[in-house]
């Protein structure tokens, strides 16, 4: 077990986002978090990562490798968890390579900064995300999709035990969505745990082995992707009629009609 929630309740005035969520995430598991806009997916990611405290009372808790996130030092926590936020605060002054190297901070051993091994790891991540030709470009000059790939490369360089990814596919074209999801699947096979907020059910069906659904009333359901991804669950989750079709072994779901429209 790398990440666990116990009776986790998240709320803000007038709305409960999730109620009594108990979830265990093990090494090698790839989780999709699905739900409508505003249902609490981002708040849940932030709470799991220790950026927010659970506000559901003393019985609500999050454990990272058996301890509350706030107990770990920042460097220790960063070895356990890597977090991709929806939006990155502030502008980074340097180039892509310098930005991706920041992911090595939890592992730096020398007081003099990065070692050759750190630089090699960063360049391997840059190459994996098809950014080699942009490695020395200022990060601020990149397109939205290129910046998103640089953010994924930074997390690869960090190499945590568990990845918390809030909409990791935003801004990416179809080729690079496939590149990212293939990479995430490989990380899971290598023993990492991943939880990612997705809006495309097709990617969840193809690459994720577990699914957590957040409904608008604070209700949650979780289980294997095979159990969770079906028309009744998805129609209740998104409040629209879904069409299911199968290509090979992959199941796909697309919205068909909205009630009353």
Language model feature labels by segment:
Residues 3, 18-20:
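Conserved structural motif at the start of ABC-family nucleotide-binding domains
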Residues 34-36:
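The feature captures the beta-strand-to-loop junction immediately N-terminal to the Walker
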Residues 49:
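Helix-to-loop junction immediately C-terminal to a conserved catalytic motif
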Residues 61-76:
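ABC ATPase NBD Q-loop/coupling interface
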Residues 163-167:
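Catalytic Walker B motif of ABC-type/P-loop ATPase nucleotide-binding domains
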Residues 231, 235-261:
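ABC ATPase nucleotide-binding domains
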């Amino acid at each position: 077990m790398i990440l666990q929630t116990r009776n986790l309740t998240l709320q803000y005035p007038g709305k409960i986002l999730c109620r009594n969520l108990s979830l265990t995430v093990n090494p090698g598991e790839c989780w999709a978090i699905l739900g409508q806009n505003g249902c609490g997916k981002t708040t849940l990611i932030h709470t799991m990562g220790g950026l927010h405290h659970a506000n559901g009372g003393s019985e609500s808790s999050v454990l990272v490798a058996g301890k509350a996130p706030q107990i770990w030092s920042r460097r220790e926590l960063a070895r356990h968890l890597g977090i991709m936020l929806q939006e990155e605060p502030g502008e980074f002054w340097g180039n892509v390579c310098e930005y991706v190297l920041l992911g090595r901070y939890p592992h730096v051993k020398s007081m003099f900064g990065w070692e050759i091994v750190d630089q090699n790891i960063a360049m391997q991540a840059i190459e994996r995300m098809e950014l080699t030709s942009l490695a020395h470009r200022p990060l601020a000059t990149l397109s939205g999709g290129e910046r998103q790939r640089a953010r994924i490369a930074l997390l690869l360089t960090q190499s945590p035990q568990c990845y918390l990814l809030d909409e990791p596919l935003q801004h990416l074209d179809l080729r690079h969505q496939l590149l990212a999801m293939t990479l995430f699947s490989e990380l899971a096979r290598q023993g990492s745990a991943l939880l990612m907020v997705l809006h495309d059910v097709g990617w969840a069906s193809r690459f994720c082995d577990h699914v957590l659904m957040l409904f608008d009333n604070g209700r949650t359901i979780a289980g294997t992707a095979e159990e969770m991804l079906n028309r009744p669950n998805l129609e209740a989750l998104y409040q629209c009629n879904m069409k299911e079709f199968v290509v090979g072994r992959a199941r796909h779901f697309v919205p068909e009609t909205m009630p009353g429209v």
